[in-house]
Amino acid sequence: MEQQQQQQQQQKSVAHISKLFVCTAVDCKDEIEEKFERSYVSLQQQIAGLSDKEMHDILTQFVCKEKQHEEISIGFLYIILTDPAMAPKTYRDITLVSRDGMNVIVANLTLLVAEKYAKLTETARRQLIWVLREFVKHQVLSVENVIWNCLRQAGGGDVSHKNLYLVESLLDIFIEYRAWLETNPFLVQSSVYSFVRLIEDHANPALISLRQKEVKFTISLIRDRFHDIIPLGRDFVRLLQNVARIPEFELLWRDILYNPKSLHPTFNGIWHLLQIRTSRRFLQCRLLPEMERKLHFLASSVKFGNQKRYQDWFQDKYFATPESHSLRSDLIRFIINVIHPTNDMLCSDIIPRWAIIGWLISSCTNPIASANAKLSLFYDWLFFDPAKDNIMNIEPGILVMYHSIRNHPFVSSTLLDFLCRITKNFYVKNEDRIRLGVYNSLKLILDKQVIPNLHPLFESPKLDRELRNLIRENFREFVTPVANMPQSMYPATHTIQAPIFKKEADQRLMQGEIMDAGGGGAFVASSGTNMLVDDDNKIAIAPLESMERENEAVFSDDENLPSTSKNEENTDDDDDLPLSKVRLKEKPVPEKVELPDAIAESFEIFVTKRNSFTWEAFLKDFRTLPASALDETQLNYVISNTVLILRETLPQQNVFSESKTEEKYLAKSISYPLYGLFRFLYENEDKSKKPFQTLLSEICGRLTETGYLLLYFMKIHCKLQTRKNAQQSYQFKTTVYRQICEATDEKIGVCLVRDLDLLEKENTTIYLWLLPDIYREFKTIAINNTELLRITLRCIDAKNVRDIMYSIAQGKLTIFKQDGLLDCIRDSLEYETYEQFCLWQLIQAHDVPLKCIQDLLPELEAANHPEALSHLLLLLKNEEPTNEIIRLLLSREAKSRGDPFVTSALRFWCQRCEEKLSEIIASLLTSKYPSSSPNKRKRPSKGSSAASSTPSADHVLNHLEHYRRSCRHGTGTGLYVHDMMQRALQSAYSHSNESTKKQFSDLFALAAEDETTAVGRRGGSGRGRKQPVGKKDSSNHSASSKKNSDVVKTIYSSDENSSEEDWSKHKVTQPAKKRKKAINDSD
């Protein structure tokens, strides 16, 4: 009996639980579930069968006790969440009996949402929204806590119906009760941060109405409450970048960049936001509570090496849909800024943060999400200030690269490439500040011994050469560490490497042309750059296997360092201790130094006005200044300020003229101070003093674009001056460019190729525009220069090829000369197919005779050089066969199945000049068998230069044999019936050994017998030579020739693989034809 009662009670409990939670047979009830069930059962027992008045009276008595008050409140909440019909009446009952302003109900509802929202039934979730609306409507205290936890349950990367319902329901509450929302600044910040993040996931056309509602609400709230939005800081900017192509957000971006005061009087622009570290509570609100618990467990309880099964579970649970990839950025930002392990954990065998982040990045297969994940990893580097930022925020970035370089070099190389390019292109206007942030990060990493040194990473042989060069350009202060001298890695005066101008399309972020209107914008690394791009401009990241165990880095934390400066940032993150003792040895900008009177005034004016006129005036004074007039400190001061001003005054985009013809655009494009230096050098070619040479050397070394901008300047300057004074000729002075090369102590050829390579990468159109001038003015260097040729070939399309050929045809451009062209072609054999086809088009445009390149014929292989062979075959078609061409052609290696190139050439020549071709080949074959030594082959002497390209008798016979096989049905067989070929074949037969006779028996069978030679198995007659036939026998001779031809046709109509015995059946008994006089080679 007791067992039956227990079973009934269990069934009753399960029935009650099933109303609120989705349970399975294996689920065990936890404390929260039992608490709600117990409260509901207790309430039902107390009010069962009572009228409303009786119920209110008895409950009023019970709620006087604290425990019973909580139990009754939870019981009512249970009814509201499970019974929609009774919810309004129950809510009125709560208001009557509650004695704490519903504080207990709100607290328990907050706990329920945070811990059990995923297990709530659909009815319970809908009733949750209903009760929240009632709470907000009646302004119940602390309801914002429930709202905030509901916002957390609105997960990113989730477009399921369940999640979309929650998102839209919360949005409707915010819109309807906007006035209440604005009374809570933290909830305003959380809702804006959350919805800007969620809008990114709602790009599907099916969600357009929801997305438009979200955009309208979010933009309105941002603009109306921008003073509450400012504390969201730099991560809010990161989220805004992902939605920047939506028209409403595009307008917001323009106000942030160009009209910040219109948003709020205290707002100073984008850098104002980027300097504020985002509070970890906002980063936390973008993770589901359950996901946060799993992540904490992974980072605090799982041993390194045992993490794979947990990662697989996490992957299947949260990354199962295409939309879920965007969640990786949220996870990485949370790990970096919220999960800060203690020193004990760092020294333990628990999986480190960098390994989790490495797994998140390497397992991402979506290119946009992958780029955003990398940005999330390095985001704090870009704005790092040692005085107030935590080293724990930059530590994972360096460790994931450092530990991956050995076993996963692809991960390290892609991250390094991303870091280099984002440093230049994230915010070009403030590149110096961004670069300083990255410099501070790397310096603190070394100071705190996060890793011993950067050399194993930056100089790893597993990085390709281009990436190592990029690292040297961006982090030259850290590239060459010296053993036992760590301070040598940090120069006394910090210099910031100048940016290399990227193509204009790569410089749209945070500039005049910032973004396109549209949806679904994303941060993508393109051609190695980081920017807002269209959806079709992506980089695919291949997934890698999970990170394997490697040696961990042990480094000291900053928690024991005393704090000596107040953290001015208003944040509730009390464990982010400022590192005030970590300082740069010197400030980036040197302090003012007194200069000699000769230059002090002009330099001060230049520093103040920063224009070309004041710059040239200073150069005029500085050029003649002797070395003794300046000490090292003064010279460094001049150089540092000069380089900084020259770089800052150059435009960040559109550095070249918009038009190649209009004077105003041309003049404007060379009006900047750097061009003033070029103008000064152009007009003053006399040798200058050492300080000026040092200044010039430093400018060229730090501003890598100096060389190609000088070439551009000379083109424009000569063009403009010639228009002003047509009677005077203005030269494209190569001497000025030589000065630049001498200043960098490099050969002019090396400098020219490097500068033109940079120019092509910056702007292909300008590169091709300058090309004729380069080949004209630097002809000794440029003509037949394979490196310059490769730069040109890699960037041209069909229209460019056409324009270059126009210039060649008009005599404006000469790329090749005959001497040395052969070497150019040999180097080009490794180029891409399209590049080789373009090359041959240009060679053809130069009217290069075949004799200049015919030496290539024996070298080319059919399998490896199809492009060159195709064009050479076309050239051969336009030529008559000569002794030299045939010699080279037949020198080609004859494969077992023949050489189609040789066969093709012989075939089309046979159609035009069969007899001449036959005589040339016959003469070549005959020359291999001297009459003085009938049984030995003639071998070329060791000193003969033509030995390597002179065909042997076997070569010639091989090609003739393969040609014979190609002649089906008697076509083309006339090559063998001419007198000289007949004699040559007979001579070859008589001088060949038995194996050769057997190998070429079919070929030798084509030769008619004469009186002195027997071919094949035919016996000789032993008779002397006949007298030539007279005119009266001419008809007989013609008949004989015809019969001979018929025999040849009969032979070729048979199977080409016939045996020697088969050939012996064809007896050729005609007398030999009248011999023609041998043709001289000169013919």
UniProtKB/Swiss-Prot annotation:
It comes from Drosophila grimshawi (Hawaiian fruit fly). It is found in: Nucleus; Cytoplasm. The modification Phosphoserine is found at residues 1053-1054, 1058-1059. The keyword Cell inner membrane does not apply. Residues 1066-1077 have a biased composition (Basic residues). Residues 942-953 have a biased composition (Low complexity). The keyword Phosphoprotein applies. Belongs to the multiprotein complex Integrator, at least composed of IntS1, IntS2, IntS3, IntS4, omd/IntS5, IntS6, defl/IntS7, IntS8, IntS9, IntS10, IntS11, IntS12, asun/IntS13, IntS14 and IntS15. The core complex associates with protein phosphatase 2A subunits mts/PP2A and Pp2A-29B, to form the Integrator-PP2A (INTAC) complex. Residues 551-579, 929-953, 1014-1083 are annotated as: Disordered. Coiled coil: none annotated. Keywords: Cytoplasm, Nucleus, Phosphoprotein. This is Integrator complex subunit 3 homolog. Pfam families: HEAT_Ints3_C, Ints3_N. Its main location: nucleus. It comes from the Eukaryota. The gene is IntS3. Component of the integrator complex, a multiprotein complex that terminates RNA polymerase II (Pol II) transcription in the promoter-proximal region of genes. The integrator complex provides a quality checkpoint during transcription elongation by driving premature transcription termination of transcripts that are unfavorably configured for transcriptional elongation: the complex terminates transcription by (1) catalyzing dephosphorylation of the C-terminal domain (CTD) of Pol II subunit Polr2A/Rbp1 and Spt5, and (2) degrading the exiting nascent RNA transcript via endonuclease activity. Transmembrane segments: none annotated. Belongs to the Integrator subunit 3 family. One of its GO terms (cellular component) is cytoplasm.
